[in-house]
UniProtKB/Swiss-Prot annotation:
Chain sites annotated for binding FAD: 20, 39, 47, 52, 92, 126, 293, 334
Protein name: Ferredoxin--NADP reductase
Organism lineage: Bacteria, Pseudomonadati, Pseudomonadota, Alphaproteobacteria, Acetobacterales
Family, as annotated: Belongs to the ferredoxin--NADP reductase type 2 family.
Subunit description: Homodimer.
Broad enzyme group: oxidoreductase
EC number(s) stated in the UniProt entry for this protein: 1.18.1.2
Reactions this protein catalyses: 2 reduced [2Fe-2S]-[ferredoxin] + NADP(+) + H(+) = 2 oxidized [2Fe-2S]-[ferredoxin] + NADPH
Amino acid sequence: MTTAPQTLNTDVAIVGAGPTALFAAFECGMLKLSCVLIDALDSVGGQCAALYPEKPIYDIPAHPAIEGGALIEALEQQIAPFDVPRLLGSRVETLEGQRGAFTLKTARGDVITAKAVIIAAGAGAFGPNRPPLDGLEAYERTGAVQYYVKKRADFTGKRVVVAGGGDSALDWALSLSEVAAQVYLLHRRDRFRGAPETLSRIEQQIAAGKIEKVVPYQLHALHGTDGVLSTVEVTTLEGTSRHIEADALLPFYGLSTDLGPIALWGLDTHRNTVPVTPATLESSTPGIFAIGDVATYPGKLKLILQGFSEGAMAAHAIHAIVHPDTALHFEYSTSKGVPG
């Protein structure tokens, strides 16, 4: 990770370093466009690496299942031939200029000049929605309360309460049921929101005694000493209380997101996203493009695979900005290989 402030000149500045950003860097390399990856996190990978490194992803083409961390490793191998610079651990604060001549400055003092910009910042700055429980911070400090599973093995033999009613809660309840002593799946409603196959697997694990469904209950209090959790107290809306002996609590109540400085860059925005032209992924500001979850347009699907396609489309559109007098002749990678 680069720590000293850098001054770089490049064809394309890519704001973000998640999977969509990494593939956009690959596409830039294939078109012989220089680029730099800039991210506030200390390592590449975005949410895949920071939040879900061991969570399987099922809709990446040619991979029946691949964990988030493994996907990032593969993408890093793919861009390795292009030796893409990375400015990590400091977010972009300001973006000024015009198409063909932009200047970006980070909080650390890095200065990047670029002919075009790709914003691949996911949902922007993100953080977990934390349950309003007294004394929560003490349990967060010890790891008794966690919002992201980085190492499933850490929960081996433990009693784990998984709170939430969506895909993340269901997926992690299933995954942890393979290593934990017991998983309690807590939701304030009787029904969960998930794919039929996932719900079927949940029922199988319930029948096997690996998961216990605790509904309709919601979190009420945590009990323990010095951040060591002993019981999770839950209640119904009618006030019925239950104490669950547990070693860990994993609340999956979604992420709170914020565009942060991006909202101050003069771009049209809509509900924490950047509207773009679907054919090019260009924003309201010529020369600034947005791809991945931060981009929006009619028919948009928030899928990694669609972000990959958007990265390719943006890179091809940018080629005309960087090389306005050179026609781009489309070639398949099988014909031209990877440029050296």
